[in-house]
Amino acid sequence: GWIIVAGSGSTMFVRNAAATLTIAVFVYPMSEDLGWSRTLIVGASSLAGLLSVFISPLSGYLIQKYGSKKTLFFSVLLLGLSSLLISRTFNPITFYILFGIGRIIFSSPVQIGAATIVAKWFINSRGKATGILGLSHSIGMGLFPLFAQLVIDLDGGNPDSWRMSWVFIGVTVWLISLPLVFFTMVDDPNEIKPKRNN
């Protein structure tokens, strides 16, 4: 059962690709390179955060219909893809759509899907398992902005160094989480053994 926590925790970790702290790293370099106002860039996070409120019921429906594994896999796939495509954006509308996708995934399907599958697998140790999910998120919240800034600084002489940083984020999301979700996660513990973990 703890391997399920590892898979779920990986999604909680990588969802920080679309965290507010992560986009904050990009505000200055993107505004300087693209000529956009900082308010415009930050606004993408705020707008998507509002939209995610209405997406949550849909996320719950998808998880109930298709299971947490499929929902989490495609959420991580989209999160990585949207990050990669942001690296190629020159248009505010395109940026809003792409970052909005990532932000909605951050706020809704990953959080709900990870909590749902852990609840199915654990009874007595559910609190500990859920706590590990929270820890995974907290670690990602600290590391993603740090790594994003490091990549920008490594190519600091280039005005569009932020683009390479988004590529790094997208690839990192895929490499860390997709294999774990695909190969280790099982929605129903009864598919493997008759009793859930304690």
PLM feature spans:
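Pair of pore-lining "gating" transmembrane helices in MFS-fold secondary transporters
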Residues: G1-T22
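C-terminal ends and interior cores of transmembrane alpha-helices
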Residues: L77-F90
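Helix-to-loop junctions at the C-terminal end of transmembrane segments
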Residues: I55-G67
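Symmetry-related core transmembrane helices of the 12-TM Major Facilitator Superfamily/SLC fold
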Residues: M164-F183
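Residue-level signature of mid-helix packing/kink "hotspots" within the transmembrane helices
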Residues: G49-P57, M141-G142
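Glycine-rich segments within core transmembrane alpha-helices of 12-TM secondary carriers
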Residues: I123-L146
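Intracellular juxtamembrane helix-capping segments at the cytosolic ends
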Residues: M30, S108-F122
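Hydrophobic core of transmembrane alpha-helices in multi-pass small-molecule transporters
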Residues: F13, S82, I93-P109
